[in-house]
C-alpha cells in the first residue's frame, strides 16, 4: 500500500518541505512511511537539553544522530530545541550546593550547550528552534515566567539566538510556539519577534506549532496569524501539526474509535488547512507533522492521559485516512 499511493513530499515538492517528528521507535516502526512521504525530520524529544546533556559536560549524541544517518541520509533535520523551560535538567540552573547560579554562569552554560550542539550538527541540521514557548499564554505578562528569565533576564532570548548564529551562521533560526493563532498570544509573539528583528538579532523565522483541533483555531484566525507574522519579513514553518479529534476542554474517554462524523470533519479540516498553506507557500517553507501515523501520537497522553486520539493522516495500521486523500487531491 505504501508505495502505491501518492507521496506527500512529491505532491508538495513545489510548495514546501513535508516533515515528521520521530523517535528511536518510530524511526524503525514507521520507516517506510517516513522514507516515502517526508523529506524533513524533527527529533520529538532526543535533541532537547535533558537528552543531549543530562549532566554537565556529558553529551549523549548517539540517539539523536540516528535521524541523520542511513536510510534517512537524504532527509533534512529540524533541530528542536535549544532553550526551553521544560525538559532542562536542574543542574543547568544550580551550583554544587543546589543554589541558583548567577546570570554570568547561566549564560556561559547556555552558550556552551548551544555551541556544542549546533556545531555538532552543522551541515545536517538546516534550521533550529532556538527558543521554544517563551511567550506567556494570557494576561498582561509578555513573557512566560521561567528559570532562564528569572536568572538571566528578558535578554536570555536574544543571547540564545546570538550564540546559535555564531555556532552556525548558515542555519536558519526560529522562535517556536503554540496557540500561535489566537489573537492575544499572536500579538505577543509578533511583538517579541519584531523587537528582536529591530535590534538586528539573527532570527529568520517563526515556528507555528499548529496543535489544532477539528474546530479551533478558525481558518480566519490561521490566515490572520500567517499574514501578521509574514509582515515581519520572516520565514514560516508549521512545526508540529496535528488535528485532534477532541477540543482541548473535551475530556471524554468513551470512544474506542473516532466517529464517522469526526473522520469526515478531520478530512475537511486538513483539506482547508493545506489549501491555506499552499496559498501562502511563498512564506511557508516547511510543514511538519508531530508524528506520521496514529499508532504513535503524544495526544494519547495529553491533555487526557491514556485516551486514544487519531490526529494524523495515517491510521494505526499505517493506511491512509480520508484526510490523506483530501490533502493530496487539493
From Swiss-Prot:
Q: Which UniProt keywords apply?
A: Carbohydrate metabolism, Cytoplasm, Glycosidase, Hydrolase, Polysaccharide degradation, Xylan degradation
Gene3D superfamilies xref list: Glycosidases (3.20.20.80)
As recorded in UniProt, its EC number(s) are 3.2.1.8
- Where are the catalytic residues? 133, 240
Q: Which GO terms describe its cellular component?
A: cytoplasm
Q: Which reaction does it catalyse?
A: Endohydrolysis of (1->4)-beta-D-xylosidic linkages in xylans
Induction / repression: By xylan and xylose.
An example GO biological process term is: xylan catabolic process
Instruction: Provide the protein's localization.
Output: Cytoplasm
Top-rank taxon, per record: Bacteria
EC supergroup of this enzyme? hydrolase
PANTHER family for this protein: ENDO-1,4-BETA-XYLANASE A, GLYCOSYL HYDROLASE
For this chain, the family text in UniProt reads: Belongs to the glycosyl hydrolase 10 (cellulase F) family. Cytoplasmic xylanase subfamily.
Q: Under which name does UniProt file this protein?
A: Endo-1,4-beta-xylanase
Amino acid at each position: 500500500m505504501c508505495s502505491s499511493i501518492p507521496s506527500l513530499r512529491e505532491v508538495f515538492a513545489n510548495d514546501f518541505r513535508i516533515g515528521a517528528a520521530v523517535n528511536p521507535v518510530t524511526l524503525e516502526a514507521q520507516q517506510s512511511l517516513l522514507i516515502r512521504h517526508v523529506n524533513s525530520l524533527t527529533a520529538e524529544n532526543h535533541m532537547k537539553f535533558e537528552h543531549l546533556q543530562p549532566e554537565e559536560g556529558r553529551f549523549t549524541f548517539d540517539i539523536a544522530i540516528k535521524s541523520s544517518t542511513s536510510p534517512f541520509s537524504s532527509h533534512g533535520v529540524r533541530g528542536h530545541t535549544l532553550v526551553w523551560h521544560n525538559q532542562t535538567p536542574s543542574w543547568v540552573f544550580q551550583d554544587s550546593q543546589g543554589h541558583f547560579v548567577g546570570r554570568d554562569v547561566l549564560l556561559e552554560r547556555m552558550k556552551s550547550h548551544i555551541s556544542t550542539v549546533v556545531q555538532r550538527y552543522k551541515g545536517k541540521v538546516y534550521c533550529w528552534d532556538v527558543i521554544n514557548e517563551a511567550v506567556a499564554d494570557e494576561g498582561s505578562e509578555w513573557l512566560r515566567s521561567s528559570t532562564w528569565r528569572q536568572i538571566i533576564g528578558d535578554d536570555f532570548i536574544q543571547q540564545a539566538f546570538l550564540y546559535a548564529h555564531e555556532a552556525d551562521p548558515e542555519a536558519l533560526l526560529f522562535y517556536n510556539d503554540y496557540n500561535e493563532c489566537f489573537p492575544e498570544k499572536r500579538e505577543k509573539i509578533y511583538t517579541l519577534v519584531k523587537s528582536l528583528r529591530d535590534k538586528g538579532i539573527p532570527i529568520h523565522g517563526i515556528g507555528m506549532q499548529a496543535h489544532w483541533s477539528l474546530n479551533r483555531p478558525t481558518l480566519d484566525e490561521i490566515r490572520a496569524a500567517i499574514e501578521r507574522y509574514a509582515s515581519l519579513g520572516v520565514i514560516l514553518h508549521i512545526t508540529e501539526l496535528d488535528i485532534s479529534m477532541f477540543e482541548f476542554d473535551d475530556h471524554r474517554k468513551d470512544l474506542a474509535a473516532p466517529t464517522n462524523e469526526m473522520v469526515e470533519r478531520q478530512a475537511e479540516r486538513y483539506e482547508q488547512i493545506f489549501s491555506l498553506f499552499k496559498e501562502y507557500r511563498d512564506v511557508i517553507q516547511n510543514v511538519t507533522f508531530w508524528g506520521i501515523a496514529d499508532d504513535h501520537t503524544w495526544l494519547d497522553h495529553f491533555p487526557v492521559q491514556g485516551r486514544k486520539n487519531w490526529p494524523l493522516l495515517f491510521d494505526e495500521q499505517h493506511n491512509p485516512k480520508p484526510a490523506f486523500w483530501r490533502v493530496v487531491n487539493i
